[in-house]
């Protein structure tokens, strides 16, 4: 007697080929950008080891008992260590911000698979060189600043590439919720980076950089062999291409000018026999200033500048703040800081789901930003009063801080990059993503740098800066919120009239 088909095989047969490939792309791009964030996290964990209070440790025989910095790593052993550590953050984030504006342009003009895989391998090399400074006993500040700059430039290859790849494979339906789940790679990468770096920080902090560097380079090789840029390359159906959509695209007029092609419509040509045939040209890549003219790009870019300032200040300085304020060792502080990223996962999914349900991205971001300001104030005064309080406050702050940041960098960027004014030109996606994330990266560079200066005067000043930045982010969305409220009220009046 022959048995029925195995359940797993029946399940595989029930899943379409398109769904399999799309699931594969989601998992791949998730893992790739997880590696990017994992490789940039170790510096925040290692900070607590580069400068330590050595008075509580037994000193070697040749060290004076009055020397409280003998266990620190030069040149970070002096009282200006916060400024020096801040300069490492600034070097990385400024180069990242500058490089991001050009990365989207290159990403649209180079093969995506080569660009992404090459960037990941280079990131792995530069990250590892930071750790090799430990084994080569390098104490020159310029060495660490140099590789922070190079790594910052290499890291810009990641975000525009993975967002463009996702945009090539997925349409707009439930984009906020899907992107909210997918964007948890940021928090997952931060958590993995913290745990991996924390495992080595107290014994050999060089491995805190080298191990993540090897991992991202290995995934870069995997990317080269397996990434599929477009559904058409493997015979899958491209997103948003039902018959009615195709007909609508054929009816769209040409929309371009002499300096900036937004879209090229379908053209009809005649062959030698006189028969007309339709030929769809590939749309040209949009220019930088053309992308800025897309409605909403400027507002969300400036909003992200301040939102990312807050998020990245937590990313780079939270472990040190916990270690100094609550007297945890570097490993425990790094482990505890991952709770902020856990909250970030929840916040990204929550913001995406609310945005999908309401269709109001600006209102969703603004409400979460409004709630963030008082929560930061409360955390500053109550956050370290007990372990349970710290855990709760870190998760809540992670939800509110990273929710808007996640929504803007994923679903909002993808929506603006495929805005109706572009008339189907998907070439704008990488450039729009790079503009929005590049603007945010300016804030990401400013936040940790200012925190390095202000923290020497007291952590209160750092939190005042974060609250001010959060308020600025809210104000920059006022015009878009007003438009969304008018649309919402208009829809309610229409429904009331129809009743």
Swiss-Prot record:
Gene Ontology MF terms: glucose 6-phosphate:phosphate antiporter activity
Glycosylated sites: 53, 62, 66
TM region(s), chain numbering: 21-40, 86-106, 116-136, 138-158, 187-207, 208-228, 302-322, 334-354, 362-382, 391-411, 434-454, 458-478
Top-level taxon: Eukaryota
Subcellular location: Endoplasmic reticulum membrane
Keywords for the protein's UniProt record, in alphabetical order: Antiport, Endoplasmic reticulum, Glycoprotein, Membrane, Sugar transport, Transmembrane, Transmembrane helix, Transport
Membrane topology term: Multi-pass membrane protein
GO cellular component: endoplasmic reticulum membrane
Reactions listed under catalytic activity: D-glucose 6-phosphate(in) + phosphate(out) = D-glucose 6-phosphate(out) + phosphate(in)
One annotated GO biological process: phosphate ion transmembrane transport
Major localization listed first in the record, in broad terms: endoplasmic reticulum
Cystine connections: none
Endoplasmic reticulum recorded as keyword: yes
Family label: Belongs to the major facilitator superfamily. Organophosphate:Pi antiporter (OPA) (TC 2.A.1.4) family.
Function: Inorganic phosphate and glucose-6-phosphate antiporter. May transport cytoplasmic glucose-6-phosphate into the lumen of the endoplasmic reticulum and translocate inorganic phosphate into the opposite direction.
Name of the protein in its database record: Glucose-6-phosphate exchanger SLC37A2
Source species taxonomy: Eukaryota, Metazoa, Chordata, Craniata, Vertebrata
